[in-house]
């Protein structure tokens, strides 16, 4: 599954909310990181030749129009277009969004149409959802796919939130030329409960406590039961500025239909993992964080990871962030492409990152990010 990254480029983040849609888990038919992403010919970062965004309203309709073109758009670079129209009212909202992508190097075009709604029938109830259709045109043939997401939310007060949702993406839905979908071929229900405690006495060292609980039951569109997931997260914010968080997760026995890359289903047993993180308040020019996690991978292997972070604020408009995450596990399960089988590895890896954020003036920002990963793995057995 593709990793989702947030966009820090001001042009693609400012006044972008008109293009927000109703999908779950950051999924969207308009994912700005696609623009200027890896080129289709060599994987290098694409250069943006021009981009324009127009936002406004006409009578009861709010609209957003977007177009971007990469260098060499006639041969290699891609062209992106999006149009969003929204009719907002006090108790309801209706919207449509269309995206179109041209990828000349692959002789591919992608058209995606979406319709979303947001209805508040009462003070504590909310209905949100979205319907999508994708139409892909390539040299090898055309395809179209359908998808939907529908949720009901219950918000009895400012401390409790509940949500139940259903999604269905067929196996030919494809919005990833300009959007982001973690996967297609999925039918899933999702249940969540959120509770916040904020009414602590003024002399309490605790400012707030939050609890998040989630459960999902997924299957693919052939009816194959995938791994159910149950997660609980607890967070505590202190008046001093420190915070602590606890995460516990259980993935219940089921099939993985992606790990073998089209070579059949893989049945996995129950897996459990959890983590604890603590961040200190800012003292002088420094803030620190530490964390530990316990993970279960593969068929029966356990592992452990550590996290250490340090943030330096040399002055108000500049901060430097350093982090290091070593991890060790003994049953890292991956698909070996050349041998067309699963392999279990004992691995040790370290992830490091250095980030600099500088805000020289209002509406100006400079961000630099360097990240590296080292892996040392030893084969244990094949399947």
Walk through the language-model features, giving the residues of each.
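Exposed, low-structure sequence patches enriched in small/polar residues
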Residues: 47, 132-383
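Outer-membrane beta-barrel channel domains
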Residues: 1-217, 248-256, 281, 292-295
């Amino acid at each position: 599954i593709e990793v989702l990254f947030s966009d820090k480029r001001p042009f693609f983040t400012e006044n972008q909310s008109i293009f927000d849609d109703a999908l779950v888990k950051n999924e969207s038919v308009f994912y700005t990181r696609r623009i200027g992403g890896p080129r289709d010919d060599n994987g290098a970062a694409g250069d943006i030749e021009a981009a324009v965004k127009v936002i406004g309203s006409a009578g009861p309709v709010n609209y957003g129009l977007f177009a971007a073109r990469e260098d060499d758009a006639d041969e290699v670079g891609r062209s992106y277009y999006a149009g969003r129209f929204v009719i907002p009212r006090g108790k309801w909202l209706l919207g449509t969004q269309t995206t179109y992508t041209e990828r000349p190097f692959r002789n591919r075009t992608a058209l995606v149409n979406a319709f979303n709604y947001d209805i508040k029938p009462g003070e504590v109830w909310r209905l949100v959802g979205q319907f999508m259709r994708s139409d892909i045109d390539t040299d090898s043939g055309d395809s179209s796919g359908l998808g939907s997401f529908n949720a009901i939310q219950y918000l009895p007060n400012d401390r409790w939130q509940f949500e139940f949702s259903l999604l269905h993406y067929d196996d030919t839905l494809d919005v990833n030329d300009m959007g982001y979908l973690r996967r297609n071929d999925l039918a899933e229900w999702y249940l969540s409960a959120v509770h916040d405690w904020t009414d602590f006495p003024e002399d309490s060292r605790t400012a707030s406590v939050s609890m998040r609980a989630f459960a999902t039951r997924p299957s693919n569109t052939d009816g194959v039961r995938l791994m159910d997931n149950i997660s609980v997260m607890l967070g505590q914010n202190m008046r001093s500025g420190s915070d602590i968080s606890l995460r516990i997760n259980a993935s219940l026995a089921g099939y993985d239909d992606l790990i073998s890359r089209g070579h059949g289903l893989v049945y996995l047993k129950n897996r459990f993992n959890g983590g604890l993180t603590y961040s200190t308040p800012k003292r002088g020019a420094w803030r620190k964080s530490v964390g530990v996690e316990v993970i279960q991978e593969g068929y029966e292997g356990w592992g452990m990871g550590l996290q250490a972070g340090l943030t330096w604020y040399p002055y108000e408009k500049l901060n430097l962030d350093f982090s290091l995450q070593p991890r060790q596990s003994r049953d890292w399960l991956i698909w070996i492409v050349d041998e067309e089988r699963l392999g279990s590895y004992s691995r040790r890896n370290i992830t490091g990152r250095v980030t600099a954020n500088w805000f020289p003036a209002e509406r100006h920002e400079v961000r630099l990010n360097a990240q590296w990963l080292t892996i040392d793995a030893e084969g244990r057995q094949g399947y």
